[in-house]
Amino acid sequence: LRLGDSQTSEGGYDGYRNITIDGGIWDANYESVENKEESGGFVGFRIGHATNVTIKNATFLNNLKSHFLELAGVKDAEITGCAFRGYWKDYEGGGQECIQLDACMPKIFPGYLPYDGSVCENIVIKDNTFEDVFAGIGSHSMVFDRPYKNITICDNQFANLRKRAIWCLNYQDTVITGNVMSNVGGGIYVRSVYTRNSHTLEGQELSAAGNQYAENILIENNQIAIADPALIDNKQWDGYGIWITGEISQGSAGENKPSEDDDPENTASSAANGVPAGRYIVRGVTAKNNMISGYGDGIKLTWAEDCICRGNTIRLSQNQMYSNTGIRVAKGSNIRILYNDMSGGNDYGIYINGTEAAKKICLVYRNTISGFSKDGICALRFAAGGRIERNRVSSNLRNGILIKYTENSIVNGNYTYKNKGKGILLQGCPSADITDNFSSRNGSNGIEINAESDNSRIQGNICGSNSKSGLCITDSKGISVDGNTFDSNKDYAAEFINSRINSNKDNEFNENGHSDNIRTKNSKISEK
């Protein structure tokens, strides 16, 4: 079904109005197509340059290589109560979304003149079912400086999708809530730009790169079960629950670039399609109260700013093809990771890397983390002043909390217990504040700092029943150790090695393995 004439539309959103499609079984019948292996496919429905469109209670079946339903330059549309099933399973070169939101441009949406760059706005996609297809809803192409706006995707059911359920490319003011996704390759993918498929209008004046971002997106109360690892088009597909990412177009040499299934290296040139080189961030995305399970990463954030992960439950299964992490952050700024509960996985619970250049601190607060194959929390080059507070971290196969190469970090009020390595370990972290933590029954030292973690404060902590010492300080100077309690540690209460302790007072020692409690080696302890 095609709406309208290919040449005579008024353009914008004024070409067609007040369209309703109610019911019907629309079978694309790909099995009857000869030479399916050749290039090309077909779209079931195409609607462009329209306002007030309703599609409801329809069933779409058996598509070949493309979209069941494609909207471009459409405002005020609802798609409700529809079912999308069946896709040629032998095709692995792409696997397009069942519902595609697009723009009126010649390379994106040909055959609907004028090509004025009109995008989709005010779209509701609700109470639909997607089964045995490649991908569900979203966009994989965009017009630079023209975001898709006011998109609501809620209460849909997705089952047995080889790729992602939802792709929000250059979306703003969007709500994704109440969806159930089972056995999907990926859950929800949010991305600022996609250089390889970004387009500009002829003569368009472009804003600076930094002005282009996806923002104000709420991802809430979704259930996502990630499928077993798979190969698609002979490439490994790394599954995920939620992936929030910006992009670095070429021209910023040496930066990490996000990868996706059909653009693994983001190899488009910096001037591809007229898009300026630069950093394109994701801003203001909140992922909260989602339930994520299965074999991929729980939540990933890359080149993100002012984003929140709150109250999510993540239950991962270990797989043999790649490592999976509860929450992973790379190159972020002002990221808040709060009140999440996560377990399983053969990598880290929370992994943060490369936020050191950010002017805004990151906060990891009141999360519960257990049963990961590496560290419960690992922060490398954390933003200066970053805070890790009041988390419960247990039964991980390495350390409870590991922080490396970070200044002025605050580690406060955490419970670390039954981890195979240290409870808390800081390496190369000057001016750290390690206060009021409880570290017990870990397989090594309760708290350890080393590698020039100078001028740090260790105060008010309780270290008990650890398999080695309660506290170990190595190769650091200007350290204060005051008001801590060391109880029933197997070796010493505290060890000071090649270090200078400026203050060591008001500490309490009870039944540690060595009666002298403190072991020193090549160290100086102030008598003050």
What is the role of each PLM region?
Residues 1-22, 31-52, 68-74, 144, ...:
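Extracellular beta-strand-rich solenoid/capping regions of secreted or surface-exposed proteins
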Residues 17, 50-53, 71-77, 121, ...:
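Short "repeat-start/strand-capping" segments in structured domains, especially the N-termini
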Residues 30-36, 42-43, 64-71, 88-98, ...:
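Short glycine/acidic-rich loop motifs that flank beta-strands on beta-rich extracellular proteins
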Residues 61-144, 148-150:
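Solenoidal tandem-repeat scaffolds enriched in leucines and small polar residues
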Residues 173, 180-266, 275-382, 387-394, ...:
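Core solenoid repeat modules with strong leucine/isoleucine-rich periodicity
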Residues 477-528:
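Leucine-rich solenoid repeat scaffolds
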